[in-house]
Amino acid sequence: MITGGASGLGRAAASEFIQHGAQVIIADVDSQQGPQVAKVLGPEAQFVCCDVSVEAQVAEAVDTAMASHGKLDIMFNNAGIAGKAIPPGIADLDLAEFDRVMGVNVRGAIAGIKHAARVMIPVGSGSILCTASISGLMGGLGPHPYSISKFAIPGIVKAISYELCQYGVRINCISPSPIPTPQVVSQLSMFYPGATQEQIAKIVNGLGELKGTKCEESDIAHAALYLASDEAKYVTGHNLVVDGGFTCFKALGFPSPDQVV
């Protein structure tokens, strides 16, 4: 099951998993696009309308997976929101907005973990994934509510891995670098109102440090497939950073010798 599977990273992951023989439940709040995506992906995909901030809907989505397939091997807690594109400073932070972002990004992920564990623990196997972000590794890369929510995810994964290890269930997360997904492009279009989608995508792709390539949705889908597969059978509690070196260093801005008087 993939939450937020109707677009962006979730849709790419759904396609990747299906190509490798999985049957996928797309759990998404978008009741218009979700069924269309499931239809495009084929008979191996099934759509379930799910707002992850409402625990009962997460529980129902997991129950649907169990009713349809008899088991849940992989739970990918991918649904997330960024909040306001041009957020206020901390002194003017809207705590209602903060709660909204945390409700989806953190509480929603915990609900997914909880109900996946509910059905995985009895069978002694399963893989749980969560989407984190490099905004949860460094400050200044996103709005405060979003960054704080993403800082929480690796901690949640490590804390819960301790318990799940006892039952043979693995849990990991992925921290992608910026990718011009529909959500990212939509957010930045408010910041760059005169820019085209192609121009915004170029800006986002230009943020990378690893030259000659760029981070794409398929890169995160491949990372998710690896962590969910038996190839990663001894990997748990891990935050797989897919950022082309973005968070590895900060170059010192020394002036060149000819600039020094």
Residue map of PLM features:
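Residue(s) in the substrate-gating loop at a strand-loop-helix junction
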Residues: 133
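Active-site helix of classical SDR
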Residues: 113, 149, 157
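Alpha-helical segment proximal to the catalytic Tyr-Lys
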Residues: 118, 162-166, 233
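Short C-terminal tail/terminal secondary-structure segment
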Residues: 82, 87, 225, 236-261
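Canonical Rossmann dinucleotide-binding motif of NAD(H)/NADP(H)-dependent dehydrogenases/reductases
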Residues: 1-25
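Substrate-binding pocket helix/loop in short-chain dehydrogenase/reductase
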Residues: 86-90, 94-99, 204
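Catalytic Tyr-x(3-8)-Lys segment
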Residues: 192-219
